[in-house]
Amino acid sequence: MARLAINVDHVATVRQARRASEPDPVTAAALAELAGAHGIVVHLREDRRHIQDRDVQVLRQTVKSKLNLEMAATREMIQIALNIKPEMVTLVPEKRQELTTEGGLDVVSFEGALEEAIKTLHEGGIAVSLFINPDPRHIKVAHRLEAEYVEIHTGMFAEADSYTRRQEEYERVVTSAKLARKLGLGAHAGHGIGYQNVLWLRNIPEIQEFSIGHAVIARAVLVGMERAVREMLALVNG
């Protein structure tokens, strides 16, 4: 049975639109857990556009399942992670002008810097996942870097504009997930996953966890957080 981790970034996006105190992503995370979510994900960006330092601090105290902190591999963020001590850190690329994370980490070009970041996080007792494109080369580098997990970027699959293209991208995800598991890495998937396309991805037995945010938060606006999470859980393990 695959696990479902809920990203609550966009609850904070609504809050920050008015620089208000609500909706609170901490409350949303608690509701997601009550509905059966296996983990909570937040991305503390360098520009603090949605999730704030306070959110991560309070979530560390309140999350009962697993807290996964997405972040860039910068000195500032690594120190924050060492102070907060989430169960897992997912290292992601970050550009200030992007609306959301646009692609996977270039682990090939930045292997040296990532090696140092991963070593530091491991010394702090934190498991590491790398958000990477579905590329066998990147899977192999992640293994060489001794990351515990990879999160396979499913954005190209989700945004495919034809059935043929979607099938091609799906096969890339399948191949990457199989290789990750063969090498002993945990295989997660995330980005662009919704209530329709998850029906494809749930058929990949090697994927152990789905990280889903925008689709669930958008659905929650209409039907409530708990129902939105329960519906996605039913699809993930249908």
From Swiss-Prot:
A GO CC annotation given for this chain: cytosol
Annotated GO MF terms: pyridoxine 5'-phosphate synthase activity
Entry's transmembrane regions: none
Active site residues according to the UniProt entry: 43 (proton acceptor), 70 (proton acceptor), 191 (proton donor)
Pathway connected to this protein: Cofactor biosynthesis; pyridoxine 5'-phosphate biosynthesis; pyridoxine 5'-phosphate from D-erythrose 4-phosphate: step 5/5
Family the entry assigns: Belongs to the PNP synthase family.
Protein name: Pyridoxine 5'-phosphate synthase
Originating organism: Syntrophobacter fumaroxidans (strain DSM 10017 / MPOB)
